[in-house]
Amino acid sequence: MPQNSAIYAVSRIRSRERSLIDRETVKRMSEGTAEEAWRMLTEMGYGAKPDAEYMDSEALIESELERTNALIKEVTTDERLTDIFFLGADATNLKLFLKRRLIGADAGGIYAHGGLYESKELMRMVQAKAYKPLPEKMAAAMDRAEAEIAAGRIDPARISTIIDQGYIDHALASGNAFVTAYFKATCDFDNLIAMARMKALGADEKRLETLLLTGGVIDPKAIVKAYQSHMGEGYAKGLPAGEMKAELQKALEEYAQSGDAAALERARDNALMRLASRGKNDIDTIAPVIGFLLAKRQEAKVVRLIMTALRNRLGADVIAERMRMLYGE
């Protein structure tokens, strides 16, 4: 249950921040064996799951994320804002269940945990094509997606974009400065990633237009124009002013060197983490609470990467390279 004291919320978060796995521990885990890394995780209480099956690191990760989600829901002073960051999992699952309905079989994809809705409830919505229980803007987006399908325009990428747009519209409507900055940056980075992916596929600008989000600092029309001019070298310098301009410029420069959309994805994840950490020392806002949630999610990615690599007996140099790919720095 949410409570009213920001100071209490921040103090609880501060006490848990000490348990975040630091880079030195990550380094030691990656340099040992899978068994040694497992022992380190269990000894530090990661996942708090003493009955976990030996070497079932995924169970530890899910347990740790569940504990984190429970803490956030307990200490938040504004459930409306923290819920936005849980809704991302629901948006992912809506895409998955809709795809499964259209294909009529298991369409693949990994079910996302930690949303606000039970998976069965989301599945019922998709089967019934009735989305009223969702937040208004997400429900409207699902209705638009259903209209596309009903008209025979079954384009998975476009439908995914429509659902993402509904989620972003819901977040931007919060009116909170931190949440707005976070999702504006998400929108801009995701649009640049879409541009890079379409370039790799040799798609035309009409195709790109259908996959761009609105709500960021960069006008989608400017992205299409840059795409038409083959993303000239001057594009990064011509980005509109905004608090993420330097981050976006750096990401585009890295992409220009590698030609790999993954460079933009890494830049996005790192930029969003830095944005989230800006309010780490606040004592009267929701920023430290959300920042901790995002840090724990990043930590889970690191643990998963290391344990998977060690189980597959990959060398330390390979793990180090994959860590660089994850962090991008």
Language-model segments: residues:
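N-terminal domain-start signal
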Residues: 1-329
